[in-house]
A protein has these predicted regions:
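Conserved SAM-binding loop of SAM-dependent methyltransferases across substrates and taxa
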Residues: 25-37
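Class I S-adenosyl-L-methionine
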Residues: 2-5, 76-77, 82, 94-156
C-alpha cells in the first residue's frame, strides 16, 4: 500500500484505539501511532508471513508497546472494548463484507475506515443494512489507479 493512500486512511481516524484487519506490513497502525491519531493499535492478519513482516516493522519503529499483533481471521481475534476504529484496506468487497458480518458483536467499534478494491456499490449497499452510515467518501489517485476510502460512523 502506498503512502498517499495510507495517509488518507490515517487522516480519517477519529478515535484513540485502532484495529487494522489484514494488516500486511502494519503501515496503517505505525503511521497512526506516529502521527498521534491513535494511542494503541492491534494489527491482525490471517497469515503468518505478513504478521511477521508487521512485527519486524513495529519493532524497527520502537512501537511494540503501542501496537500488538494477532494472528487470525477478520475480527475474530479482537475482543469487544479493544478498538473504537477498525480499518480494512486492500481487499475485495466480498471479503470485507464477510469480515464485517461479525460487527454486531462489538459495541465498542464506533468507526470503520474501509477501502475495498472492488464493487464499491455493493459495499455502499451492505453498509446501509448495518448500524453504520457513510460519513465521508474519498477518492485518491496513486499512479494510474484510483482508490475509494469510506469513513463510516456508528449510528448512536
Amino acid at each position: 500500500m502506498r503512502r498517499k493512500r495510507i495517509d488518507a486512511i490515517v487522516s480519517q481516524i477519529q478515535y484513540n484505539t485502532l484495529a487494522d484487519i489484514g494488516c500486511d506490513h502494519a503501515f496503517i497502525p505505525i503511521f497512526a501511532i506516529q502521527s498521534g491519531r491513535v494511542k494503541n493499535a492491534i494489527a491482525i492478519d490471517i497469515s503468518n508471513g505478513p504478521l511477521l513482516n508487521a512485527e519486524k516493522n513495529i519493532f524497527k519503529k520502537g512501537l511494540a508497546n503501542e501496537i500488538k499483533t494477532r494472528l487470525g481471521s477478520g475480527l475474530k481475534p479482537l475482543l469487544d472494548g479493544e478498538a473504537q476504529c477498525v480499518t480494512i484496506a486492500g481487499m475485495g468487497c466480498e471479503t470485507i463484507i464477510e469480515i464485517l458480518e461479525d460487527l454486531d458483536k462489538f459495541s465498542s467499534i464506533l468507526q470503520l475506515i474501509i477501502s475495498p478494491q472492488t464493487k464499491l456499490d455493493l459495499f455502499r449497499q451492505f453498509i446501509s443494512t448495518t448500524d453504520f452510515y457513510i460519513e465521508e467518501e474519498l477518492t485518491i489517485e496513486e499512479g494510474k489507479k484510483k482508490y475509494t476510502i469510506f469513513s463510516c460512523k456508528k449510528i448512536v
